[in-house]
Amino acid sequence: MIRNATIEDVPRMQAVINSHAELGKMLFKSYAELYEHLRDFAVFEETGEIIGCVGVAIIWADLAEVRSLAVDEKARGRGVGTKLVHWCIDEARRLGIRKLMSLTYEQRFFEKLGFEVVAKETLPLKVWSDCVKCPKNENCDEIAMVRVLPEVPPSTHLTAPPTPRGISIPVLMEMEAE
């Protein structure tokens, strides 16, 4: 069953996320990061054990990110990841967010869920704030994907501006250092 994450879930969430980070599939998460963003996360619990988790990070009024989608290796292939992404889609709808994005290596998985590949440059600069912590930031090989939720009306707020031309992830590192 999927439920909102609680303080008690953080150690297991970190273990599942960081097992994928060790393989270079996502960023490591500290306890502090998970506690700070706990309200953004859901967990998949089965027979009292957390076997997966995911977060929805709001980027802008019209865009949220599927973040830290991780499923325990023992539970892979059983639809846990799909159910967690559906939770993200439902959460975006509930919040009135029209677009959901992911930076991923699992293109086919997300395509099956209605996501489409987009140019990274079409995403707002704020998306790249985590990239300064990534060892691959200068050679990012993740695929940017977006799913538009047509049933959610367009936001009346400003939409997030795309990354300006000429700005690249290495420039973000220089900007962060200032």
Model-flagged regions — what are they?
Residues 28-41, 45-46, 51-71:
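A conserved beta-strand-loop-helix scaffold within acyl/acetyltransferase catalytic domains
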Residues 71, 77-94, 102:
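Conserved acetyl-CoA-binding loop-helix of GNAT-fold acetyltransferases
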Residues 1-28, 45, 142-144, 151-178:
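Short amphipathic alpha-helix that is part of the acyltransferase structural core
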